[in-house]
Structures are given as structure tokens and as C-alpha cells.
A protein has these predicted regions:
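Positively charged, small/polar-rich N-terminal and surface patches that mediate targeting and assembly
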Residues: 1-136
């Protein structure tokens, strides 16, 4: 199945494995919570157990060094793409209110980005992530 949109996550390539998993989970939660119809129906196994629904389309995960991540962030902003961000400061906080305060206290050009995630039309996503490699 081909979708008109793509979901992309861009992670800074110098993160520890646990940080990559944590950042990805937090970033995609922002997308899931704001796009109606993006989450499908619950899953059920043959034994009758029910599981939570997931995205109806794939999530593409890219890696980038800090300058390339900043470039992708700028491209997304320049195209008015709504995105979730995760900054290094958020590793030191423990809840949503503190996370939002940490972001609010820093100008956009000074955010220490470690990851971004967004959903947009295919061609726009392709332009934002141009030159990036899939996460290995």
C-alpha cells in the first residue's frame, strides 16, 4: 500500500542506544496524538488477546550528525511542517511540564536538538530528509 504521506524520525547519530529508543518513542507519540486516523484498530491474536493499535503506515527512521539534523529541522520549519522535537535538556527532566519549560527557555536557533519527527506529504518529507541515511 502506498501512502500520500510519510512519517519520519531523524535522530542525532551520537546518542546511546537507550537514548535513541527513548527519543523515538517520545517523538512519535506527538504525531500519534495529533493526526486523526493515523492510528489503526486494536490487534487481536488467535487466543483472543487484544493489543493496542499502532500507526497505519510505516515510520522511517533516519540518522544524522548534529549539523545535518539542524539542517533538516530548518528545512521542516521553512516548509511549515509541524514537528515534534527532543532536545538534550529533556534527558534531565522527568515530566511533560518540565519538558515544555526546558524547550520554552531556549530560542529555536539555540535548541540542542537530538531528534525530530514529523508527518507530511511524501515529497515534502523527501526534501526535508534529503541527504540523510536510514538509521542502521
Amino acid at each position: 500500500m502506498r501512502f500520500d504521506t510519510k512519517i519520519a524520525v531523524v535522530l542525532r547519530d551520537d546518542l546511546a542506544a537507550w537514548q535513541k529508543a527513548n527519543v523515538t518513542a517520545f517523538l512519535v507519540s506527538g504525531i500519534a496524538g495529533t493526526v486523526p486516523g493515523l492510528v489503526g484498530e486494536p490487534y487481536r491474536d488467535a487466543s483472543g488477546n487484544e493489543y493496542l493499535p499502532m500507526f497505519v503506515q510505516p515510520v522511517l527512521v533516519y540518522q544524522a550528525d548534529a549539523p545535518a539534523l539542524r539542517r533538516a529541522y530548518g528545512r521542516a520549519l521553512g516548509r511549515d511542517v509541524s514537528m515534534a522535537i527532543y532536545t538534550a535538556d529533556l534527558f534531565e527532566t522527568g515530566h511533560d511540564e518540565a519538558n515544555r519549560a526546558a524547550v520554552a527557555g531556549v530560542a529555536s536557533d539555540e535548541l540542542d536538538l537530538v531528534g525530530i519527527a514529523f508527518r507530511a506529504e511524501r515529497r515534502i518529507v523527501d526534501k526535508v530528509v534529503d541527504g540523510l541515511r536510514f538509521h542502521a
